[in-house]
Amino acid sequence: MKKLALLLTACLILAPLAAKDDDKKKGKKPKKETIEVCFVLDTTGSMGGLIEGAKQKIWAIANEILASEPTPNLRIGLIGYRDRKEAYVTQVHDLSDDIDDIYAKLMKFQAQGGGDTPESVNQALHEAVTKIKWNKSKKVLKLVFLVGDAPPHMDYQDDVKYPEICKLAAKKNLILNTVQCGSMASTTPIWKEIAKLAEGDFVAIAQSGGVAAISTPVDAEIAKLNRELGITVVAYGDSDKRRVVRGKIALAAEAKEEGAADRLSVLSFKSKAVAEVSGVGAADFTSAYVDGGGDLVDDLASGRVDFDEVENEKLSEEVRKMSKEERKKYLEEQVAKRKELQK
């Protein structure tokens, strides 16, 4: 997984550097990059270690991308694939800038089934190119990462085969990178060919993904802060939106200690980018805790919603029952707690 993170970071961050350096030489402010990434993951049983590693590392990878200056617009998509006659052939989740939502979808991936080779690689890769709603601009960096251990079925007559898929990718300015897990001999030449045909990179990593959770002395403290910040969230929106927000908070609270810091950092980077665009000064800046909106405390702290403009029907039943005075006091306390915790 370390090699995968390094490959991803190199492709995402180093690729735009030349253009940024040119801007600096000309005295221009570097333009904000837009980056779109789709992970195409083999979710059969042999990939258990890698899938669990991805769940641990997705925040770290997003953090690495967002740390570049200026903070890029990042959208991530996911495709999980197995094979025909399995519980599913593919599960497609389109590009989203809501990293909390992507994390929730990734958490639902379980490595099961398989046991034989090959797998439905061609179908998954074709859907990454044709079903994902990629930005049509040539200025947007668009990357696919095919991660798996088994070669594609070449005997499915109704499949579009990978050589043709690579041609389609080129027409859409997509770069296809391949990550081979383990050392299955029949996979290596195909993974290398896909990367070569689609101007991408190939890397081989251990079947387990090489994930080692490294804790630091402050991890427990940050995990505690993560949970305390979650308590300050007031879900706001229609019933579906409030349900989604509650789900995100629950997943965040369960995040492993070593992942909590990366998650908070990602949200801080994204909030600062929004603040820069809207002209909010550093002294007034408050980081969001829930990606994708739906947190009234964040809306109030950022000035998007005024205390007197809170819509009753968008509140949970518990908060709705409060008198107007009680509600305002409660919300002011939550905003104050959020700011105190984020000092």
Residue spans for each PLM region:
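Positively charged n-region of N-terminal signal peptides that target proteins for export
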Residues: 1-4
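C-terminal "exit" segments of structured domains
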Residues: 196-198, 202-306, 332, 337-343
